[in-house]
């Protein structure tokens, strides 16, 4: 089995101790990490040393990050195709647009909307991990996804970060 941690919309320009702690807690035991964009700065990915890292840029990424990361990417893990794209435009019909952009993929991972989602449409598993940073003053905790890839199945789940006390 392959366990993949999924996050998006971190919107930070430097790694904080709290970010490190959240990542260590959320992605313990993960073999790989997918960041679905709006990491803002490429240095954020250095948090995940020792893991395979797959990322795309988002609309809030700085210029250097946009030059280093693609807008879309397809990876293959354990025989499954996983399309990664931050997403653009309005929330309405975003998954239809992603299906046209990444046709035939077994799983599509995206961000942009800050709304955690994990469901199947036809033969495609959609995962949007929501915003890893949460919504601050609005009180919603950060969220992330986990993808379990076995020989004969893909299963995703959404989780909330433990709130700071």
Regions found by a protein language model. Name each.
Residues 28, 47-50, 77, 100-103, ...:
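Short, conserved loop/helix-junction motifs that constitute active-site signature segments
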Residues 1-51, 61-70, 139-142, 165:
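N-terminal active-site segment of His-dependent metallophosphoesterases
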Residues 156-165:
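Short, solvent-exposed aromatic-acidic interface loops
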Residues 54-55, 90-157:
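Conserved beta-sheet core of the metallophosphoesterase superfamily
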Residues 15-26, 84-85, 89-102:
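Pre-active-site segment of Zn-dependent metallo-hydrolases
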């Amino acid at each position: 089995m392959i366990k993949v941690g999924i996050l998006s919309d971190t919107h930070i320009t430097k790694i904080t101790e709290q970010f490190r702690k959240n990542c260590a807690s959320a992605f313990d035991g993960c073999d790989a990490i997918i960041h679905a964009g709006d990491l803002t700065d490429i240095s954020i990915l250095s948090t995940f040393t020792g893991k395979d890292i797959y990322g795309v840029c988002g609309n809030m990424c700085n210029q250097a990050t946009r030059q280093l990361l693609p807008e879309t990417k397809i990876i293959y893990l354990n025989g499954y195709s996983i399309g990664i794209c931050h997403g653009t435009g309005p929330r309405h019909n975003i998954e239809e647009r992603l299906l046209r952009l990444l046709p035939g993929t077994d799983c599509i991972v995206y961000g942009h909307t800050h709304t955690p989602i994990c469901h199947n449409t036809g033969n495609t598993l959609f995962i949007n991990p929501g915003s890893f940073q949460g919504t601050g003053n609005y009180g919603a905790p950060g969220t992330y996804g986990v993808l379990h890839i076995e020989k004969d199945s893909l299963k995703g789940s959404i989780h909330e970060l433990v709130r700071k006390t």
